[in-house]
Design a protein with these regions (language model features):
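Periplasmic OmpA-like peptidoglycan-binding domain that tethers envelope proteins to the cell wall
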Residues: 53-59, 63, 86-163
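Periplasmic peptidoglycan-binding/tethering modules of Gram-negative envelope proteins
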Residues: 1-82, 92-94, 163
């Protein structure tokens, strides 16, 4: 006998140890391509993309995740957090990190993503002195270069806990 149950499973924040580093493992926070915000995609009357962005559901989920992170951080005030921004490298070339030859330079873009998330966490009550932001560019991908279906995974932020 087989039964099917439909429902929603809430995914919470986990803390994992990677060597000597504590990271908050969170559901994906999704950014627009070549942007450091949660701008919503706009379609014209024909359904064509007028302004690129993420879906309203993705933006709402991003905010839900950040609120939950802030809630946890506000309970554990003896930790500071480094928000690490990451970007998606298209070429894997070092000049992509610092020049606009292939699109926006990845180092400043990833730093802007980290700063954006830091600002959102502050708006949810996390003290500014507990937060720092760094940009890692496209040097630490989670999806391989050229994997167009999963490139969005490289446009991310990670949360490093410091005691």
């Amino acid at each position: 006998m087989t039964s099917v149950v439909e429902g929603k499973i809430e995914v919470d924040i986990l803390v994992i140890r990677a060597g000597d580093v504590l990271k908050m493992a969170v559901p994906s926070i999704i950014f627009r391509q070549d942007a450091a915000d949660f701008g919503i995609q706009v379609l014209d009357s024909d359904g064509k993309v007028k302004k690129p962005g993420i879906t309203p559901a993705q933006a709402a989920n991003n905010e839900r995740i950040l609120k939950r992170i802030a809630e946890i951080l506000n309970k554990f005030k003896n930790y500071t957090v480094t928000v690490e921004g990451h970007a998606n490298s298209v070429t894997g070339l070092e000049e992509e990190e610092t020049t606009n030859k292939y699109g926006l330079a990845l180092e400043p873009l990833s730093k802007a993503r980290a700063e954006f998330v830091k600002t959102r966490l502050k708006s949810y009550g996390v003290a500014e002195e507990r937060l720092s932001a760094v940009g890692r560019g496209g040097r630490q991908p989670v999806s391989r270069i050229g994997d167009k279906d999963n490139a969005w995974k490289n446009r991310r932020v990670e949360f490093i806990l410091n005691k």
